[in-house]
Amino acid sequence: MKLLMLMRKFLTGLLLCGAIVSAYGDVWDEVSHGYADNNGVKIHYATTGTGPLVIMIHGFPDFWYSWRHQMEGLSENFQVVAMDQRGYNLSDQPEGKESYNMEYLVSDVAALIRHFGSDKATIVGHDWGGIVSWQFAFARPEMVENLVILNLPHPNGLARELASNSDQQENSAYARRFIAGSATDPDILFGGPMNSQSLSFWVSDPKAREKYVKAFDNSSFDAMLAYYKQNYPRVSEGNTPPPAPQLDVPLLVFHGLRDTALHSNGLNNTWDWNDSDTTIVSAPDANHFVQQDAADLVTTTLKWWLLSRQ
């Protein structure tokens, strides 16, 4: 049976439940760091906890630390591994935009799972991490225990909205600039330059922002844009890609409804494209970075949802 919508009122009750703690700390000094090798490309990760493997994949502009609240909340029951995607922070930054083709991003996740001696894991992705997570589930379904997506509609839904929804088309103007432009263009990032400070504009916590600035100092801006140049959907009215493969995996989707990049209409029909149970959770007051804007809601719901499947 498909669960189409988990009501926020019910989730708020979970947050108040004494069985699950609703406030989570910072794991910066608690995690262990390491590298997985993918055909000579080193993929950095931070990990904490013990138990079934959970892989967390960040988006743009971000790094492993985006998942700090969820890592703390899940670590009692799961081994949580948050990766730096290639091009970001401490992971390798291979030359050439072709090095960021989706097949390589997907293979990085597979290499990370194998690095931990596992043949499958729960895959959690936000933004570009969400795109990679969807594609990983299509390409390597046997390696996906559960799939969790944050603020990135199913590719079928995103393609539909890009082709027909003027709001989504307007929201995606930045992506078209990234595809056509260069990291050195003076107006590439929402009318201004791309640098470590400007990329951290969305981080409200001053201490966290310091960490983001340092991580972006270590990152490749050309690599960040290569994700868009190589993989962003080229969709127009009457010209949409073929439907994505049908999924059959437990699926949990979060969406911050104040997202100005990805329209929530893209969530419609998600349940039609998955033959297993599908749960969609909206966070009305959260922006694009829902894992931070609604940290307690996301962490507590994710923990409950995963534990219910053990």
Segment roles from a protein language model:
Residues A286-A295, T299:
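Catalytic histidine-centered segment of alpha/beta-hydrolase-like enzymes
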Residues D26-V31, V41-I43, L53, W67, ...:
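Flexible "cap/lid" subdomain of the alpha/beta-hydrolase fold that forms the substrate-access gate
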Residues L11-A19:
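Bacterial N-terminal signal peptides
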Residues V21-G25:
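Sec/Tat signal peptide C-region and signal peptidase I cleavage site
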Residues T47-L90:
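Conserved HGGG/HGGXW glycine-rich cap/lid loop of the alpha/beta-hydrolase fold
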Residues K2-L11:
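Bacterial N-terminal signal peptides that target proteins for export
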